[in-house]
Amino acid sequence: MSEESDGKLIEDSLIQLRCHFTWKLLIEAPEIPDLENRIWEEIQFLDTKYNVGIHNLLAYVKHLKGQNEEALVSLKKAEDLIQKEHANQADIRSLVTWGNFAWVYYHMGRLAEAQTYLDKVENTCKKFANPSRYRMECPEVDCEEGWALAKCGGKNYERAKTCFEKALEGNPENPEFNTGYAITVYRLDKFNTASGRNKAFSLHVLKRAVRLNPDDVYIRVLLALKLQDEGQEAEGEKYIEEALTSISSQAYVFQYAAKFYRRKGSVDKALELLKMALETTPTSAFLHHQMGLCYRAQMIQIKEATNWQPRGQDRETVDRLVQLAICKFEKTIMLKRTFEMAYVDLAETYAEIGHHRKAEEHFQKGLRMKIFEDQLKQEIHYHYGRFQEHHGKSQDKAITHYLKGLKIEKMSHSREKLLNALEKLAKRCIHQNVRVVESVSLLGLIHKLKGEVSDALLCYERALRLAADLNPIF
């Protein structure tokens, strides 16, 4: 048989495997540097028992960069960890790693070695009487697929959640499966408008994960943030204080504790924690972004305290904080060019000091980006609409972008903000007797989108009467 025929047979077998090469991970080329950086941070600074998968993901990223020899090194590390941490179920736990080995060797043209790893997968499938030669359905592989998807960004979260749910069906008390599920559900919360029931469920899965993983401080700080979201800040702060006394996963604890304290209004404490975290992870886009948000929060605090007219020392402090915030947001973008909200935050900071041209430039960069998450698209249209309404003095453009955001039907917190902003603008126009027919029609649309059909009809009827008064022919 020719080498070409061998290659085709091997390729037909490879596509049946369950591993990073067949999971259709959505990773854009500009995202790879930041993804690799976050993987290395996790390897170095996150104290976890669940670290085999991260070496597999690193191997896949190395392959995407054309570094197949480095990919093999990462896969060997994963193999060693399996023998060390999962010796009693090494076969099952090795399926993904072996699949990745086979793919990397195939891409290197080393077909005999690729076949060796295919044989390992096939033998394990036979051992467990699996009906497929190369595809094993088991909770452990579902879990690893979930971790890979979760690490690759928001556009993969729904699929990650499904994977962890599938894993939990097979083993509902497994600590790792519960941890992955809780983290993914927590991250998805920001994309969705949750009902009271769903919010309670999100809180429940985090508490369950903490119970099953009592030594995992990372999941504890996420629970703290969730409690803060739900108005239970005092209870959340207890978890934060406990986590800060631990030496485990300090870089991660510091960054999430900082987020907690910034949202609480304790911005100085948040900045102190962020600076400590940056000592160990200086290339973290997340940390630089959080620092920018802190500096901007301090600037807004001073403006509010001076009735938005700071003078003297306050003016100097505001100017200094604005420059610090701009510097941090620009650093964020340099480290992660696909950090969409960093462009928005940078634009809004420029708008605060009247640099509208620069603000417009950065808003346009955010609007032009290829964005997969509907909630994020809504959020950017919301912020740009606000910019046009309050800084650009263009109600037309503001309305256009509020409506563009609302055309995206995803139910989310951002959609609620768009509805509220459009409603306030329409009511203000009516109060000022400006474009009343159009504004009343917009109120009708808002009621319709809220499901308030009778109120919507009343608004539309009123708009028709007003239009008829203005133009009897109509």
From Swiss-Prot:
One of its GO terms (cellular component) is cytosol. Keywords: Repeat, TPR repeat. It comes from the Eukaryota. GO terms for biological process: defense response to virus. InterPro entries: TPR-like_helical_dom_sf, TPR_rpt. One of its GO terms (molecular function) is RNA binding. TPR repeats lie at residues 52-85, 95-128, 141-174, 182-216, 218-250, 251-284, 305-339, 340-373, 378-412, 437-470. Belongs to the IFIT family. IFIT1B is likely non-functional, lacking the critical antiviral role of IFIT1. Unlike IFIT1, which is essential in the innate immune response as part of an interferon-dependent multiprotein complex, IFIT1B does not prevent the translation of viral RNAs that lack host-specific 2'-O-methylation at their 5' cap. Consequently, it probably cannot inhibit their translation by competing with the host translation machinery. This is Protein IFIT1 homolog B. It comes from Homo sapiens.
